[in-house]
């Protein structure tokens, strides 16, 4: 093996994108493929983990509403522990790790322990969601700037968000703001006094994507009738989401949840073909690969939890 080809100890802080596996960057894919250990978030598409080697260790460190979560301090400690005992560690996060992904805390820990690292950007939810609406976050003559903000603060504090961008005809993208939506919409009404268009995109780019549109004065009522656990939602406020097409709001289509059974390398190609047309996919290679115990256990749990509408056997 040449010096350039040798794999050195390193931690990659990788953005997995918004959910559709076809939106994973090539760099992120290469990091996953060479990882010895993957620490992954709840929002990561399960199929993306299956791009890894069968002998890679998977560790779930996700923060999930309504359930116990892994504290950030524990995640930081795991990064150090695994980096000191393995060659390549991937910290796999939904979206872009540098946008509300607490990447600075993990970087500070790695620097403190002199562990080499690299941040690998991913497609963030706001831009992915707008692509699904057939719109841009900015629009000439309508919105010339964009603000990303979060509705979820440290220690669950309910801090005010900066509405300056709306006062200046910009676009506001609110991450993790569904629980605080009534309060946030009320703040816009009181401080700005304009009934802006609003769109909320749940599970953007995934097969179970769901879009709800309205205005600042109506959107809370419209999402109140939805099931409690719709999945992650990004809220877009501003004139860029005015007059959305009916096809965007109700796309129709017969999307399936597909289980592909077979050896991983071969199954990945088939799974990608289904994912590219909007279907949810998972690989079951437990009988074909010498899997790391964490992989076998995780795949078995996913299969038990998911309802598949189609199974494809490659044997």
Language-model regions: role of each:
Residues 2-64, 164, 273-278, 286, ...:
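Glycine-rich, flexible N-terminal cofactor/catalytic loop recognition
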Residues 9-11, 87-89, 153-314:
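A contiguous loop/helix-start segment that scaffolds small-molecule binding in enzyme catalytic cores
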Residues 18-19, 43-45, 61-68, 123-125, ...:
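Short, acidic/turn-prone active-site loops that include or flank metal/cofactor-
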Residues 36-38, 58, 136, 172, ...:
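Short, well-ordered beta-strand core segments
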Residues 43-46, 50-82, 99, 302-307, ...:
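A cross-family phosphate/adenosyl-ligand binding-site feature
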Residues 82-85, 102-104:
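Ligand-binding beta-strand-loop-alpha-helix segment within the catalytic cores
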Residues 92:
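Ligand-binding face of N-terminal immunoglobulin V-set domains in extracellular IgSF glycoproteins
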Residues 96-168, 286-300, 308-314:
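Class I SAM-dependent methyltransferase SAM-binding "motif I" and its flanking Rossmann-like core
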């Amino acid at each position: 093996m040449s010096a350039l080809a040798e794999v050195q100890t390193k931690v990659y802080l990788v953005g997995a994108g918004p959910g559709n596996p076809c939106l994973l960057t090539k760099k992120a894919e290469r990091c996953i493929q060479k990882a010895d250990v993957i620490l992954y978030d709840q929002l990561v598409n399960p199929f993306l983990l299956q791009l890894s080697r069968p002998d890679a260790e998977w560790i779930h460190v996700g923060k999930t509403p309504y359930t116990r979560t892994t504290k950030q301090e524990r995640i930081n400690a795991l990064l150090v522990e695994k980096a000191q005992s393995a060659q390549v560690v991937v910290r796999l996060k939904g979206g872009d790790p540098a946008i509300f992904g607490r990447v600075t805390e993990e970087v500070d820990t790695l620097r403190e322990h002199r562990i080499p690292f690299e941040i690998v950007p991913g497609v963030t939810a706001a831009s992915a969601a707008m692509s699904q609406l057939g719109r841009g976050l900015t629009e000439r003559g309508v919105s010339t700037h964009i603000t990303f903000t979060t509705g979820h603060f440290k220690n669950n504090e309910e801090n005010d968000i900066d509405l300056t961008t709306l006062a200046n005809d910009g676009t506001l993208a609110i991450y993790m703001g569904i629980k605080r939506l009534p309060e946030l919409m009320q703040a816009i009404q009181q401080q700005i006094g304009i009934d802006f268009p609003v769109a909320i995109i749940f599970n953007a780019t995934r097969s179970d994507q769901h879009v709800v549109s309205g205005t600042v004065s109506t959107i809370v009522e419209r999402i109140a009738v939805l099931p409690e656990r719709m999945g992650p939602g990004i809220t877009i406020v501003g004139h860029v989401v005015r007059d959305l097409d009916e096809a965007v709001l109700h796309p129709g289509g017969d999307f399936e949840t597909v289980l592909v059974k077979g050896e991983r390398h071969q199954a990945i190609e088939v799974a990608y073909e289904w994912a590219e047309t909007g279907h949810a996919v998972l690989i079951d290679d437990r009988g074909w690969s010498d899997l790391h115990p964490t992989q076998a256990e995780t795949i078995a749990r996913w299969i038990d939890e998911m309802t598949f509408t189609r199974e494809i056997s490659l044997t």
